[in-house]
A protein has these predicted regions:
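Membrane-interface loop-to-helix entry segments
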Residues: 1-3, 138-146, 152, 194-222, ...
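Terminal cytosolic tails of multi-pass membrane transporters
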Residues: 11-25, 293-294, 306-352, 375, ...
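N-terminal alpha-helical transmembrane segments of multi-pass membrane transport
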Residues: 1-76, 194, 217, 431-447, ...
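Helix-loop-helix module between adjacent transmembrane segments
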Residues: 3-10, 44-47, 87-159, 167-193, ...
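Hydrophobic alpha-helical segments of multi-pass membrane transport proteins
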Residues: 3-13, 212-223, 301-311, 352-371, ...
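Loop-to-transmembrane helix boundary motifs in multi-pass membrane proteins
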Residues: 126-136, 171-190, 194, 260-269, ...
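Hydrophobic, small-residue-rich membrane helices and short re-entrant helix-turn-helix hairpins
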Residues: 116-133, 193-212, 274-297, 381-386, ...
Length: 461
């Protein structure tokens, strides 16, 4: 993941960053909508669920990288946030949509290859995999991995909403209540997937960003504004300073398997299909625009979001020890968001607003990934609405099965995500080679003033 980020950043800052991707000279989707669709698809419900829960967990129990820091103290704030930044920062975003997207856009728009995961190997294998069974296996593994990565947020949201309803209404949180909530969520994003990218998905993404910004402003106004900005700056500095050692740490395998390896397995599993989705909406964008947006702007925005929600919870815990840690200990991660918001002014408005935002975030991810899977299966940019609907519903069904298998807990969901990402990691790793090759060939085509390039010839530097 470090290599992906470094390579992508070097390409973006070089003269190759000016290369326009796709068959259109100008972007086909406005910048605001483009950024909104990218961010909302990855953040999903995790952007709300984990942004509140993860920092407070690392604050109470510092990660192995900061084992010398005493938990629950002011000194533990920056390390806690910086550990969260690692999981949701530059490296995670880079692996999702930089080199892999460049390769797919080259293969599809320059060489006419179908937009499928197997196309990530096109720069080195040509069309050998187009009709080969190995190509089908690659596509199948990628579909399973992204389905798992999408099912995770759907399941997380079901547990979050079920717990919230228990606290707000007194109704018992049970597996049945989670399944009912899951059914409602799946219905929402299935309708959006059926409506298509130009209607349901773009509308959902736009509303998500507007809602997220509004709620972020509310947190900054009603919460500990100075504390949030101060600790964000300190945590970001700590993150940059300790990035190499945190990302390469293997000090505690059991801890890593629950945190770092889980998150990175999640994002790697997402990568091929996320790249397909970004490639579909990025025609007319330059390589530099893509990389700066995906690997720089999006991670920083995500980190500030984590600082705002997670930092608020940490501040409240510092002011009143036990106010956040006690609900966390008693009810687990889903309790943190509610415990934090309940202590702010106008909590009766903030709590339902955040729950609605979490739901629409997950709906955006379910919608976009159903669209990407349908594209990979049909091999077309505009898959049929029934194909999109089928995959939207199937992801919900599997999420329900995993919730039942895990008795409503998170362990089954997390294990499913990590296991399915293993074979995909090899495919994503190849982009270290195919990414630069694709860039060189697109540059060659640009210099020759061609709309397409001889995709079989070698490129000399």
């Amino acid at each position: 993941m470090i290599i992906t980020f470094v390579l992508a950043f070097i390409i973006a800052m070089s003269s190759y960053g000016k290369i326009k991707m796709g068959s259109e000279s100008k972007p086909t989707i406005g910048t605001f909508r483009w950024v909104a669709m990218i961010m909302c698809t990855l953040l999903a419900g995790g952007g709300v669920f984990w942004s509140a829960a993860e920092p407070i967990f690392h604050f109470i129990t510092p990660s192995p990288s900061f084992s010398d820091v005493k938990g629950g103290t002011l000194a533990a704030v920056a390390p806690a946030l910086s550990q969260s930044f690692l999981h949701w920062g530059f490296l995670a975003w880079a692996v999702l949509g930089t080199l892999s997207t460049i390769v797919l856009m080259y293969a599809h728009y320059n060489c006419g290859v179908k937009l499928r995961p197997r196309a990530l190997l096109y720069p080195i294998l040509g069309d050998k995999l187009e009709n080969h069974w190995i190509g089908s296996v690659i596509d199948a593994c990628s579909i399973i991995a992204v389905a798992a990565g999408t099912i995770g947020p759907i399941g997380f949201l079901a547990t979050q909403l079920s717990y919230s309803l228990t606290v707000l209404t007194g109704l018992e949180s049970s597996l049945m209540s989670q399944i009912i909530i899951l059914t409602v969520i799946v219905s929402i994003y299935s309708v959006s997937a059926f409506s298509g990218m130009d209607k349901g998905l773009q509308w959902l993404s736009r509303m998500n960003v507007i809602g997220a910004v509004a709620l972020l402003v509310a947190i900054l106004v009603l919460g500990p504004t100075g504390f949030i900005f101060k600790e964000f700056g300190m945590a970001f500095g700590t993150y940059i300073q300790h990035l190499p050692e945190m990302s390469l740490s293997t000090a505690d395998p059991s801890w890593n398997s629950w945190w770092t390896w889980f998150f990175w397995g999640w994002f790697i599993g997402f990568a091929p299909m996320m790249a397909i989705f970004i490639a579909r909406i990025s025609q007319g964008r330059s390589i530099r625009e893509l990389i700066i947006t995906v690997a720089i702007i999006a991670p920083i925005a995500t980190n500030f979001w984590f600082s705002s929600l997670g930092g608020t919870g940490i501040f409240l815990e510092l002011q009143t020890p036990g106010s956040i840690s006690q609900p966390l200990q008693e009810a687990g991660l889903p309790a943190v968001l509610l415990a934090s918001l309940a202590q702010l002014p106008f909590s009766f408005l903030l709590i339902p607003a955040f729950l609605v935002l979490t739901t629409t975030f997950v709906a955006t991810t379910g919608d976009s990934m159903a669209y990407s899977i349908a594209m990979a299966v049909e091999g077309t940019d505009t898959p049929s609405r029934y194909q999109r609907l089928f995959w939207a519903v199937m992801m919900g069904v599997v999420a329900g099965v995993l919730l039942i298998a895990g008795d409503g807990g998170l362990n089954a969901l997390q294990s499913f995500i990590v296991i399915t990402a293993v074979p995909v990691s090899f495919l994503v790793g190849v982009t270290f080679i195919t990414g630069p090759i694709a860039v060189l060939r697109m540059k060659s085509a640009e210099l020759e003033s061609k709309s397409s390039v001889d995709c079989t010839k070698s490129v000399t530097v």
